Amino acid sequence: MIRHLITTKDFTKDEIEDLFDDAQKFLNEPTPHLLKNKLIITIFFENSTRTRSSFEVAAKRLGAEVVSLDVSKSSTKKGETLFDTAANLNAMEPHAIVVRHKSAGVPYILSKYVSCSLINGGDGAHAHPTQALLDLFTLKQHFKAVEGKKIAIVGDIKNSRVANSNIELLQRFGMKVILVAPPHFLPKTDLPISYDLHAIINEVDAIMSLRTQTERHKYPIYASLRDYGNDFCITKDLIKDKDLIILHPGPVHRNIDISDEVLTDPRCKVLEQVKNGVAVRMAVLKKLIMHG
């Protein structure tokens, strides 16, 4: 049966633990070319540095062929519908397609038009499942057991697909989540919230800082990003010598999301997230293509 990864809910807890076992092996051992002669197509309708390159490196390390569709030169710019694009890509008989789109729901809809696994590389402010998976993997790598650990998600939560996916996944694995942001960056939620980062810093084991999604704002909310950073930047003065770790999905707005000093602090796991992202995406590709 063909399976897709549209949201984190598409995999059970047991399946995710198995994924993480594979990801750890990929980090520790030479990678066998498990996907030799397999074809993976990436099509990103929104800009991406980390996610796209991470999927492509993951596929190539597994021995797969990768075709990246340049949307700026594709037929969608000439009036071809998304569904025609999906049908044409599907006719090339790929084994998986990775899609990113600015509109929520597009990967789910496209999955109905293809006969291979479709992976959501991010859709609007809806979901980014592989980012949440690599974030959880990074947290488990550090804490071993994450159940009962408390994480603050800080920043533009309302517009963040990363936050949406992490809120679902981290809670499913027993983590406590608190949302920290100015009121206009918070979604309607039953989760605990705070408008003051300093007020909750002593009660959390981890902080996930998010980028301000200015491209998704209908009008300027802050006079400048610097004003936002004055209240919500993760600084050395904030974290002092506390026993916690810091995550960020990237790209980081330096000295607005996280200070230069904290980015070089060993408690900041941003580069580990990038490294882990390749291994986790390798595990996802292996699972969907080889096992369904």
UniProtKB/Swiss-Prot annotation:
Lineage, uppermost ranks: Bacteria, Pseudomonadati, Campylobacterota, Epsilonproteobacteria, Nautiliales
Recorded catalytic activity of this chain's protein: carbamoyl phosphate + L-aspartate = N-carbamoyl-L-aspartate + phosphate + H(+)
UniProt key word Amino-acid biosynthesis: no
Protein's organism: Nitratiruptor sp. (strain SB155-2)
Gene3D superfamilies listed in its UniProt record: Aspartate/ornithine carbamoyltransferase
The name this protein goes by in its record: Aspartate carbamoyltransferase catalytic subunit
Binding residues annotated for carbamoyl phosphate, in chain numbering: 50-51, 100, 128, 131, 250-251
GO cellular component, as recorded: cytosol
Function noted in UniProt: Catalyzes the condensation of carbamoyl phosphate and aspartate to form carbamoyl aspartate and inorganic phosphate, the committed step in the de novo pyrimidine nucleotide biosynthesis pathway.
Family named by the database record: Belongs to the aspartate/ornithine carbamoyltransferase superfamily. ATCase family.
Record's keyword terms, sorted: Pyrimidine biosynthesis, Transferase
Residues reported in the UniProt entry to bind L-aspartate: 78, 161, 211
Pathway named in the protein's UniProt entry: Pyrimidine metabolism; UMP biosynthesis via de novo pathway; (S)-dihydroorotate from bicarbonate: step 2/3
EC number, UniProt record: 2.1.3.2
Listed GO MF terms: amino acid binding; aspartate carbamoyltransferase activity
Subunit (UniProt): Heterododecamer (2C3:3R2) of six catalytic PyrB chains organized as two trimers (C3), and six regulatory PyrI chains organized as three dimers (R2).
Entry-linked Pfam families: OTCace (PF00185), OTCace_N (PF02729)
GO biological process, one term: 'de novo' UMP biosynthetic process
